[in-house]
Curated annotation (Swiss-Prot):
It holds the Pfam family Ribosomal_L30. GO terms for cellular component: cytosolic large ribosomal subunit. GO terms for molecular function: structural constituent of ribosome. Keywords: Ribonucleoprotein, Ribosomal protein. It comes from Persephonella marina (strain DSM 14350 / EX-H1). The keyword Methyltransferase does not apply. CDD domains: Ribosomal_L30. InterPro entries: Ribo_uL30_ferredoxin-like_sf (IPR036919), Ribosomal_uL30_bac-type (IPR005996), Ribosomal_uL30_ferredoxin-like (IPR016082). This is Large ribosomal subunit protein uL30. Part of the 50S ribosomal subunit.
Length: 59
């Protein structure tokens, strides 16, 4: 199963651990999108920054 992740809010003023989580998902700027494999590391990072991103499941 794969998921599409999109950064919808900026990182200005966010904590360093949140910025690292967004970067580890491969997102750099607002409106960046990545399609990632669903695994525990990715899901943990998504959970940490769920207020900054938009997530969709992709077949």
């Amino acid at each position: 199963m794969r998921i599409k992740v999109k950064l919808v809010r900026g990182l200005a003023g966010k904590r360093k651990d949140q910025i690292k989580a967004v970067r580890s998902l491969g997102l750099k700027k607002v409106n960046d999108e990545r399609i990632l494999e669903k695994n525990p590391m990715v899901l943990g990072n998504i959970n940490k920054v769920k207020h900054l991103i938009q997530v969709e499941e992709v077949e």
